[in-house]
Swiss-Prot record:
This is Flocculation protein FLO5. It comes from Saccharomyces cerevisiae (strain ATCC 204508 / S288c) (Baker's yeast). The keyword NAD does not apply. Residues 763-781, 948-958, 1027-1038 have a biased composition (Polar residues). Residues 197-240 are annotated as: Sugar recognition. One of its GO terms (biological process) is flocculation. InterPro entries: Flocculin (IPR001389), Flocculin_t3_rpt (IPR025928), PA14/GLEYA (IPR037524), PA14_dom (IPR011658).
């Protein structure tokens, strides 16, 4: 476009603007519906790179609506457009403002852009609507509400690509028809249509004269053909204020209402809103009177509206006019009319006119009375009353009441102290009744003067906050003159630890409450001094009403507290009595700890306080600390050449899962009526108590036996550690077993370990220190258990009986329960032994006696749920231990049973090897099955053992401080003496029929056997363990009996040397290494 054409275009636009301003006839609207903030925006399709369609005025006015409508949004107040196309660079994709683009498509700060400017891009950059801002036409419609009357100048700062703006009805859209199709007017307020192959100037404007309070239709149409899109919109108000981009508070939308007849206001300058109201009133005239009154009101949209009120007065009937005369104090006659509504006898309401004539009263009918009041000036009022004269006629009397300020005697002045720094005066009015029964107003003037310095008290208190807090509390104290006085207490709270604050209340002879803070230093159990704050509150009381009492308590410091009680004296009057309670720390012996099992999953600690009366007759508080620990399963382990099997059993009644030997299955089906004995054993820092608890933790004991072999499994309390074994056996190895269980309340999962104690065995003395006291109590009973027998992967269950022994051990406040099942056997053993522990290196003397005898017990045998009772002999084992003068007695009953176990046999192939040459033979074998449960997973272990012909018997006995076991295997004899720290375990042992068929398996035991007499040193770690012996057939062992004899001879020599001097020990070690 040339410069000449450009100038002509601007002149035309200016001329059109002047015409609009001069005419002042822009059409406005007054929609009656509910207005909504913002404008509605409709989106229409526009072809990419179409640079001709948007240059058509008809298209920009209404032709766009023929295109595909893409959607719409509402409530938009920020109506400017500023869209930037994306730039895809090596550093990422970012919107690039048009003013930052350069060269052959590059963007400042991002470098060269690899994408094209001439393609369509989708985004929600236009009013949140997902479309292609690069090529689109949109229409904005709404109502502009001018806040002032005057000229409004709208402006497009720049246009890219084409836009128009129209203001006014019949130009933008018709009133109350915002959502209708666009009208065909091309009389644009701002014409920003881009000419064909040309450009537009900046800052295109259009001016409209608008009247405040009217709604003017506003429409903006914008088209973009490619790439960037720009349309900043602003308006300048008559007062010079400019609104840019955000038009909130200026643009609104209304729903269409085509039926509203008065929606369009063609010329607001001559528009007036008026209403006519007609009212009818009765009057005393004889004709109808009509009058008109004009008022101006403001309507809801802020417009002034003229209101015409037509008043019609009609004559009332004579009977509805009432005239009344009243005297008054004026000097002239006053007439007034009052209108009331009365209901006649016909039930119809009728207007009644009351004419009130007030005439001046005669001087004699006027009464004047004077009353005092609390005001500061004289008040005069008139009251009208009616009196009846001597002639019986009523007469109006006027009473003039003059209220004068009250005399000085009715004014009371009181002075009160207060904590302010200036004098405060206030007036309070009260009503009192005089002797004449009449109420009288009394004025009380209260003067508050600053109190003297002595009435302000400052106290410091500790608190648990992290900063210093200052507050003021007002209290009232009564002095000796009986007058109340305000006292100000300034409380300063300083941070301190929570546990070091003590508050005590003390009576005193003063007349007010005194609060003070005392700081003392106490030394804690760690030896460190700590500041303690004691808040002392002293309350007034008579000297004789103070009582002090001292009580013991379990704290580590002295506590003083004050308790207030009310007593009634002989005069019947209540009196406050102050009781000062001083609690002093009790001795350590008044704190008792007890441990109880419970079914919870955690350890619970609670404290119970009881009061006991000592020998001096004084009550003393005793603190009982109750520790409840959960009962859990006890783990037992079986060590063998094939590894370790761990099983755990927890049940409300004992369950035995036997590990069968390779040569048979043991089934016990009898029960023993329980008898119990209570004993005690003192050991290091442990308290042992025993009781039968069916729901407590149980330990599963493995049982091994043959059909012709019986076993005795005593329950014992013994020691293990370094042990000396004297063995006479023809076997090539030894066997040992014990039961290991964890303390369920121990903080670790290791085996229980106790400090060493002194024990004595034959031919050996050992010295060690004794720990603090431990007590053991054991009780026994019988129960029915389920025995599972398996063959060829088929298992059956049967009911059997066993003796149940339960013991509890308390170490450092942690209690462990041990349960033992003692099977009923046929072995009879009667033997007594004695052991003596001598005092060495200052340790205490201990004497251990073990006796075994037989007695008769009642046995219940059950089969197919039918039980019978028989009398049977039983072995009674008794052990006593004396440590520090405390004796522990442990008794075990094991019945002598005649029950034989049932076995199952099958044919197996036996491979025998000698000197590297192996041969296979077929032999009958006993099949047994063992089960192990780990984490609720059950594993079945079958064992096949070729049958043997030898028989053996086993007898064992228990010793509290020592353990001595005698094993009969043909001509073999085994004696074991054990010295170690005290360990609690249940011992179960059986022997097989073969003298060469015993295999020892213990992770911490080294044993050497010989054919003759062999001295074997066994070293065992401090533990509580469980071992179950297993047998191995002679045919499965490598080597001949000759070789075994030769090795045993070396072993015998080595063991003999071990008991000699140091040189002998060295030689013995070489011999053992050769073996």
């Amino acid at each position: 476009m040339t410069i000449a054409h450009h100038c002509i275009f601007l002149v035309i636009l200016a001329f059109l603007a002047l015409i609009n301003v001069a005419s002042g006839a822009t059409e406005a609207c007054l929609p009656a519906g509910q207005r909504k903030s913002g404008m509605n925006i409709n989106f229409y399709q526009y072809s990419l790179k179409d640079s001709s369609t948007y240059s058509n005025a008809a298209y920009m006015a209404y032709g766009y609506a023929s295109k595909t409508k893409l959607g719409s949004v509402g409530g938009q107040t920020d109506i400017s457009i500023d869209y930037n196309i994306p730039c895809v660079s090596s550093s990422g994709t970012f919107p690039c403002p048009q003013e930052d683009s350069y060269g052959n498509w590059g963007c400042k700060g991002m470098g060269a852009c690899s994408n094209s400017q001439g393609i369509a891009y989708w985004s929600t950059d236009l009013f949140g609507f997902y479309t292609t801002p690069t090529n689109v036409t949109l229409e904005m419609t709404g109502y502009f509400l001018p806040p002032q009357t005057g000229s409004y100048t709208f402006s497009f700062a720049t246009v890219d690509d084409s836009a128009i703006l129209s203001v006014g009805g019949s130009i933008a859209f018709e009133c109350c028809a915002q959502e209708q199709p666009p009208i065909t007017s091309t009389n644009f307020t701002i014409n920003g249509i881009k000419p064909w192959d040309g450009s537009l100037p900046d800052n295109i404007t259009g001016t409209v004269y608008m009247y405040a309070g009217y709604y003017y239709p506003l429409k903006v149409v914008y088209s973009n053909a490619v790439s960037w899109g720009t349309l900043p919109i602003s308006v300048e108000l008559p007062d010079g204020t400019t609104v840019s981009d955000n038009f909130e508070g200026y643009v609104y939308s209304f729903d269409d209402d085509l039926s509203q007849s008065n929606c369009t206001i063609p010329d607001p300058s001559i528009h007036t809103t008026s209403t006519i109201t007609t009212t009818t009133e009765p009057w005393t005239g004889t004709f109808t009177s009509t009058s008109t009154e004009m008022t101006t009101i403001t309507d809801t949209n802020g417009q002034l509206t003229d209101e015409t009120v037509i008043v019609i007065r009609t004559p009332t009937t004579a009977s509805t006019i009432t005239t009344t005369t009243e005297p008054w104090t004026g000097t002239f006659t006053s007439t007034s009319t009052e209108m009331t509504t009365v209901t006649g006898t016909n039930g119809q309401p009728t207007d009644e006119t009351v004419i009130v004539i007030r005439t001046p009263t005669s001087e004699g009918l006027i009464t004047t009375t004077t009353e005092p009041w609390t005001g500061t000036f004289t008040s005069t009022s008139t009251e009208m009353t009616t009196v009846t004269g001597t002639n019986g006629q009523p007469t109006d009397e006027t009473v003039i009441v003059i209220r004068t300020p009250t005399s000085e005697g009715l004014i009371t002045t009181t002075t009160e102290p207060w904590t302010g720094t200036f004098t405060s005066t206030s007036t309070e009015v009260t009503t009192i009744t005089g002797t004449n029964g009449q109420p009288t107003d009394e004025t009380v003037i209260v003067i508050r003067t600053p109190t003297s310095e002595g009435l302000i008290t400052t106290t410091t208190e500790p608190w648990t906050g992290t900063f210093t807090s200052t507050s003021t509390e007002m209290t009232t104290v009564t002095g000796t003159n009986g007058q109340p006085t305000d006292e100000t207490v300034i409380v300063i709270r300083t941070p301190t630890s929570e546990g070091l604050i003590s508050t005590t209340t003390e009576p005193w002879t003063g007349t007010f409450t005194s609060t003070s803070t005392e700081v003392t230093t106490i030394t804690g159990t760690n030896g460190q001094p700590t500041d303690e704050t004691v808040i002392v509150i002293r309350t007034p009381t008579s000297e004789g009403l103070i009582t002090t009492t001292t009580e013991p308590w379990t704290g580590t410091f002295t506590s003083t507290s004050t308790e207030m009680t009310t007593v009634t004296g002989t005069n019947g009057q209540p009196t406050d009595e102050t009781v000062i309670v001083i609690r002093t720390p009790t001795s350590e012996g008044l704190i008792t700890r007890t441990t109880e099992p419970w079914t919870g999953t955690f350890t619970s600690t609670s404290t119970e306080v009881t009061t006991i009366t000592g020998t001096n007759g004084q009550p003393t508080d005793e603190t009982v600390i109750v520790i409840r620990t959960p009962t859990t399963a006890i783990s037992s382990s079986l060590s063998s050449s094939s590894g370790q099997i761990t099983s755990s059993i927890t049940s409300s009644r004992p369950i035995i899962t036997p590990f069968y030997p390779s040569n048979g299955t043991s089934v016990i089906s009898s029960s023993v009526i329980s008898s119990s004995v209570t004993s005690s054993l003192v050991t290091s820092s442990s308290f042992i108590s025993s009781s039968v608890i069916s729901s407590s933790t149980t330990t599963s004991t493995s049982i091994f036996s043959e059909s012709s072999t019986s076993s005795v499994i005593p329950t014992s309390s013994s020691t293990s550690g370094s042990s000396e074994s004297k063995t006479s056996s023809a076997s090539s190895s030894s066997s040992s077993s014990s039961i290991s269980s964890e303390s369920p309340k121990s903080p670790t999962n290791s085996s229980s370990s106790l400090p060493p104690v002194t024990s004595a065995t034959t031919g050996q003395e050992t010295a060690s220190s004794l720990p603090p006291a431990t007590t053991t109590k054991t009780s026994e009973q019988t129960t029915l258990v389920t025995v599972t027998s398996c063959e060829s992967h088929v298992c059956t269950e049967s009911i059997s009986s066993a003796i149940v022994s339960t013991a509890t051990v308390t170490v450092s406040g942690v209690t462990t329960e041990y349960t033992t099942w003692c099977p009923i056997s046929t072995t009879e053993t009667t033997k007594q032994t004695k052991g003596t522990t001598e005092q060495t290196k200052g340790t205490t003397e201990q004497t251990t006696e073990t006796t075994k005898q037989t007695t008769v017990v009642t046995i219940s045998s059950c089969e197919s749920d039918i039980c019978s009772k028989t009398a049977s002999p039983a072995i009674v084992s008794t052990s006593t231990a004396t440590i520090n003068g405390v004796t522990t007695e442990y008794t075990t009953w094991c019945p002598i049973s005649t029950t034989e176990s049932k076995q199952q046999t099958t044919l197996v192939t036996v491979t025998s090897c000698e000197s590297g040459v192996c041969s296979e033979t077929t032999s009958p074998a006993i099949v047994s099955t063992a089960t192990a449960t780990v984490n609720d997973v059950v594993t079945v272990y079958p064992t096949w053992r070729p049958q043997t012909t030898n028989e053996q018997s086993v007898s064992s006995k228990m010793n509290s401080a020592t353990s001595e076991t005698t094993t009969n295997t043909g001509a073999a004899e085994t004696k074991t003496a054990v010295t170690s720290s005290l360990s609690r375990f249940n011992h179960a042992e059986t022997q097989t029929a073969s003298a060469t068929d015993v295999i020892g398996h213990s992770s911490s035991v080294v044993s050497v056997s010989e054919t003759g007499n062999t001295m074997s040193l066994t070293s065992s770690g401090l533990s509580t363990m469980s071992q179950q012996p297993r047998s191995t057939p002679a045919s499965s062992m490598v080597g001949s009996s000759t070789a075994s004899l030769e090795i045993s001879t070396y072993a015998g020599s080595a063991n003999s040397l071990l008991a000699g001097s140091g040189l002998s020990v060295f030689i013995a070690s070489l011999l053992l290494a050769i073996i």
